[in-house]
């Protein structure tokens, strides 16, 4: 397995990882996905568009239209 990056943990039964822009209430099917590194659960982390795990406060801001 590949080493996990900053703010990631190896998880045998991964769930739905939240991405920047998604909130805690985003629906998720309760099923295991293949083992992989995921953003540290329960710590308010989100996956950015370029694959990094960052705190919600560091998610890129959407530009107004």
UniProtKB/Swiss-Prot annotation:
Main location: secreted
Entry GO terms, CC: extracellular region
Gene3D superfamilies from the UniProt entry: Laminin
Compartment annotation: Secreted
Pfam families named among the record's database cross-references: TIL
SUPFAM superfamilies found in the cross-reference section: Serine protease inhibitors (SSF57567)
Result for mutant: residue 25 to N: In inhibitor 2 and inhibitor 4
Stated role: Defends the organism against the host's proteinases.
Name of this chain's protein: Chymotrypsin/elastase isoinhibitors 2 to 5
Organism: Ascaris suum (Pig roundworm)
